[in-house]
Amino acid sequence: MQIILLEKVANLGQLGDVVNVKNGFARNFLIPQGKAKRATEANLKEFDARRAELEAKQAEILADAKVRAEKLNEAVITIAQKAGVDGRLFGSVTNVDVAEAVTAFGVQIKRHEVRLPNGPFKAIGEYDIEIALHHDVVTPIKIVVVGEA
């Protein structure tokens, strides 16, 4: 299926690109999330008319991501979890827990923006992770997991 991208999509293309994707990917993911439209003549004309508006919106989203990245740059976030005497956690620290801790720190992020390269944290310690606020804006932070009494 040919689609027009309404925003930058990783490993696919930039705003305004007409690309071929599998039907299910377009119908179930890209179109419902507003990332793309079918590449019909009417949609191509509508996109050309709205191109400047969409580019301005994407520039605003990128600027907002850069501002949030400045606030988070090299931040150290502490998360307290119940742990055993050997330093292993009862449960784990997931991307949801990290997103809540960063939001409490003062920067609003969503759970899908948190990148945990080795999966959830299962032990007390310091972990370096990345927060992907935008495709082009990724900022490193340090998570310190401490045990609760």
UniProtKB/Swiss-Prot annotation:
Disulfide bonds: none annotated. GO terms for biological process: translation. It comes from the Bacteria. One of its GO terms (cellular component) is ribonucleoprotein complex. Pfam families: Ribosomal_L9_C, Ribosomal_L9_N. GO terms for molecular function: rRNA binding; structural constituent of ribosome. Keywords: Ribonucleoprotein, Ribosomal protein, RNA-binding, rRNA-binding. Transmembrane segments: none annotated. NCBIfam families: L9 (TIGR00158). PANTHER family: 50S RIBOSOMAL PROTEIN L9 (PTHR21368). Belongs to the bacterial ribosomal protein bL9 family. Binds to the 23S rRNA. This is Large ribosomal subunit protein bL9. It comes from Chromobacterium violaceum (strain ATCC 12472 / DSM 30191 / JCM 1249 / CCUG 213 / NBRC 12614 / NCIMB 9131 / NCTC 9757 / MK). The gene is rplI.
